[in-house]
Amino acid sequence: MAKIWDERNEWQTMLDVEIAACEANAELGRIPKEAVEVIKAKADFDVERIHEIDREINHDIIAFLSAVGEYVGDEAKYIHMGMTSTDVKDTALNVQIKQASDVLIADLEKLAEVLKRRAVEFKYTPTIGRTHGVHAEPTTFGLKILLWYSETLRNIERMKRAASEMAVGKLSGAVGTYADIDPYVEEYVCKKMGLTPEIVATQVGQRDHHAEYITTLGVIAGTLAQIALEVRHLQRTEVREAEEYFSPKQKGSSAMPHKRNPVKSERICGMARLVQGYALPAFENIPLWHERDISHSSVERVMIPDATTALDYILAQTTDLVDKLLVYPEKMLEDLNMTGGLIYSPRVLLALVSKGAYRDTAYRWVQRNAMKRWLEGEDFYENLCKDEDVRKYLSEEEIKECFDYKPMLIHVDKIFARFGL
């Protein structure tokens, strides 16, 4: 990713656009073919020289063209014919975004493979599901990971759509009318650069493309933050059902030698906020004055390289996190039983209803016994067995049958089968 956003690659991509435009103009007879051969043979640039000229004239694209012209000589007069600065800048930028997107898609595919493997590994590992942070009903740890896998598959498709949205080029002149350039030049350059022509433009391609792209990066970052946040919760000392890999020589605190902190997960959550934060300036870049102002440019020079680079990094970090995640099934089972069977209250309720009890009334019977467990530590199962209202409908054996997590997980295979697993 660093190579894609390297300044040398940026200018080289712009030079590739300029040379392709010269080739197209030569086919149209606007440039001598011999001149194009000279341009292709001699065209080069020195980054420091571009900066030197830019400091004097305060226009980076003209500085670039001047620096290239010093290498090419007289034939440089044919470079940039009929084009405006954004013709080359926008088209080259979208080539770089295409390259960055390929990296991000590959990252996502690696993450998906790791998630799939670990989901299958813990397919039948029972754990407690939590809603509002409170014990709810049993699930499996494999289902948790399968959820992340499913979301990652969607993110791969989102990323492909976003990359396609950005794979457009624009060489239509100062206000998008092709006043001084033939539309064929745009078609030729875009085909050569792996893009399609923007169907209508002003001086720039419209920034709704970029807003959709950056928003997609933010959605993907949200998935990664969700994975990392779950690990952070599960690694809390009083939970410790799973935790980040901790290397033998790793240290968790400068003051507390005992510490094993979820630093990678915290880093992922933090950097996800950074990626998501770029959605706002991307939205604000959409409205530009008339046929174009330059307010979007300074934002994009920071936003796009930074967002793609940050996402590339946290995708790699998340893949490593999941791949090496330490999982403790025994602690998961211990925590599942922590509430003394309160998590089976839905099964007791349904058993009562199936025997003819009115639902709201049965709910109150089960709830009053559950509250005794919550508030006074009394045995939930024994209290149910002693409850006269409950016993009118359920035998002690029928109540006992409710206290089993296995029937609550009988459809795990069916859910996995939806993914061919």
What is each stretch, according to the model?
Residues 1-13, 53-57, 256-421:
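Glycine-rich cofactor/substrate-binding loops
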Residues 186, 190-279:
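Acidic, glycine-rich loop-and-beta core segments that form the ion-binding/anion-interacting portion
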Residues 1-172, 178, 182-188, 197, ...:
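A helix-coil-helix interface module used to build multimeric assemblies
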Residues 24, 67, 71, 114, ...:
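Generic, well-ordered alpha-helical scaffold segments in large soluble proteins
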Residues 51, 98-105, 109, 116, ...:
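Short amphipathic alpha-helical segments with heptad-repeat character
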Residues 31, 36, 239-240, 358:
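Conserved hydrophobic residue
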Residues 121-124, 158-161, 165, 195-199, ...:
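Conserved helix-loop functional segments at active or binding sites
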Residues 143, 211-219, 347-355:
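Short, well-ordered beta-strand elements within core beta-sheets of diverse protein domains
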